[in-house]
Curated annotation (Swiss-Prot):
Source species, domain of life: Eukaryota
Protein function: GTP-binding protein that may be involved in protein trafficking. May modulate vesicle budding and uncoating within the Golgi apparatus.
Protein name: ADP-ribosylation factor J
MF terms in GO: GTP binding; GTPase activity
Entry binding sites for GTP: 34-40, 75-79, 134-137
CDD domains assigned: Arf_Arl
Taxonomic source organism: Dictyostelium discoideum
């Protein structure tokens, strides 16, 4: 009986202290090839609406409060000439979100090459990777199994990874993907 009372009090105080703890600061790097929908996805999550976007030259940065996290999301342009600059955003990243255009089958080899390059970066060692398989609202979108196979994701053994099908335009799958990121960061 005494131990039950002690456990109840411990749980009570733990819950009280968590209220004052605040949100855990995290840094998320959002990258992907040009036209994948990175900015659309970011602003759909931030503003709850689809905004008109133009190709990102450089980066967009937004802070998003999600669950117990304060996520600073760096959305970096994906044009071929900009990709060498991605390395300048690696430092301090807690997670990488790689947005893929699920309808762009011709560029999956290029996506795989970029993901493989991320996996060998010292500054990203152990950093989890969420692959948003975007544009699932389109008829010719690749499903999750096709994305996993095309990118050979099952060969990744040194970190957590997850593929979340989504449609940035319709908000489908966005919150589920960020749930995975939040849960993974909290269990790290």
């Amino acid at each position: 009986m005494l131990s039950e009372l002690f456990n109840s009090l411990a749980s009570f105080f733990s819950n009280i202290f968590s209220l004052f703890e605040g949100k855990k600061e995290t840094r998320i790097l959002m990258i992907g090839l040009d036209g994948a929908g990175k900015s659309t996805l970011l602003y759909k999550l931030k503003l709850g609406d689809v905004v008109s976007t133009i190709p990102t030259i450089g980066f967009n940065v937004e802070t998003i409060e999600y669950k117990n996290l304060s996520m600073t999301v760096w959305d970096v342009g994906g044009q071929h000439k900009i990709r060498p600059l991605w390395k300048h955003y690696y430092h301090g990243s807690n997670a990488v979100i790689f947005v893929v255009d699920s309808t762009d089958r011709e560029r999956m080899d290029e996506v795989k090459e970029e993901i493989d390059n991320l996996l060998i970066q010292d500054e990203l060692k152990g950093t989890q990777i969420l692959v948003f398989a975007n544009k699932q609202d389109m008829n010719n979108a690749m499903n999750t199994a096709e994305i996993v196979n095309s990118l050979d994701l099952n060969s990744i053994k040194d970190r957590k990874w997850y593929v979340q099908p989504c449609s940035a335009i319709r908000s489908d799958g966005i919150y589920e993907g960020f749930d995975w990121v939040a849960n993974s960061l909290n269990n790290k």
